[in-house]
Amino acid sequence: MAASALYACTKCTQRYPFEELSQGQQLCKECRIAHPIVKCTYCRSEFQQESKTNTICKKCAQNVKQFGTPKPCQYCNIIAAFIGTKCQRCTNSEKKYGAPQTCEQCKQQCAFDRKEEGRRKVDGKLLCWLCTLSYKRVLQKTKEQRKSLGSSHSNSSSSSLTEKDQHHSKHHHHHHHHHHRHSSGHHKVSSLSPEQEQGLWKQSHKSSAAIQNETPKKKPKLESKPSNGDSSSINQSADSGGTDNFVLISQLKEEVMSLKRLLQQRDQTILEKDKKLTELKADFQYQESNLRTKMNSMEKAHKETVEQLQAKNRELLKQVAALSKGKKFDKSGSVLTSP
């Protein structure tokens, strides 16, 4: 037997069979686990993660170095407004399509009317960028689930045919009628008309939750015979589920970071107020001590002045008393000497 061809992984360049590589980027299983496709924390666009600590894409990393931490966009609320109050995606869409309108899914004022060409991709709905991505992801899942349902029907019909072929050797006449009925029923299941397929596609869009509940019952049959298309579809659905979980984790991390920033700002404000209050208290104590010192010095000077004035007053009183006595002596002497 000829050896099967090996193909190189685009990340580690090691060679693997074609069935073991992913359909899109041709990555091996280890590289898909080590470098998953995640969404950027800021712009929410998908990129291949180089390390577990890297949660933003290269473009946002360059913008962070150049412009600093972004702010939430005033339209879509995505934390990607590096310049001004709007992100680059909303700025370009506003220039091209005009003012934003209300999204039919999230009810935010962040959906841009892309006319018939853009609405045709989302069944005529007016959706914002994030809701459009989630809607397309649901469509992709329903298509993959339809393929898995079709393959499971074909596998079940082929297994039933083999069992009836074994039974055909014993009961030929009975099997002839039974095989005719089974083949006609199988033809009805496998060959649907275009109108029926379109109706099934629309029904799968409307009841995607019911289809998602039915598909886990068919998974063991799919896993028994993996091929490049089936394994890639399973990997894509698993990656999309992991991406949704990572989006939720990223949103929770953003909320935690915003709350931490808010808490730090409040702590900083409290520290500044405490510092200002301490400075005011120190200034008040300094002024109070100065005023007390000044008041004590003034009281001391006042007491000294009063004491000096009292002493001077006593001396003056003594002088007045002495002068009054001298006048009396003078008057009495003049009276005695007169004839």
Curated annotation (Swiss-Prot):
The modification N-acetylalanine is found at A2. The keyword RNA-binding applies. Residues 215-224 have a biased composition (Basic and acidic residues). Residues 144-243 are annotated as: Disordered. GO terms for biological process: mRNA stabilization; negative regulation of inflammatory response; negative regulation of macrophage activation; negative regulation of protein export from nucleus. Disruption phenotype: Enlarged spleen with white pulp hypertrophy. Increased population of CD11b+ myeloid cells and decreased population of CD19+ B cells with no changes in CD3+ T cells. Enhanced macrophage- and microglia-mediated inflammation. Interacts with HNRNPA2B1 (via C-terminus); the interaction results in retention of HNRNPA2B1 in the nucleus and inhibition of the NF-kappa-B-mediated inflammatory pathway. Belongs to the FAM76 family. This is Protein FAM76B. It comes from Mus musculus.
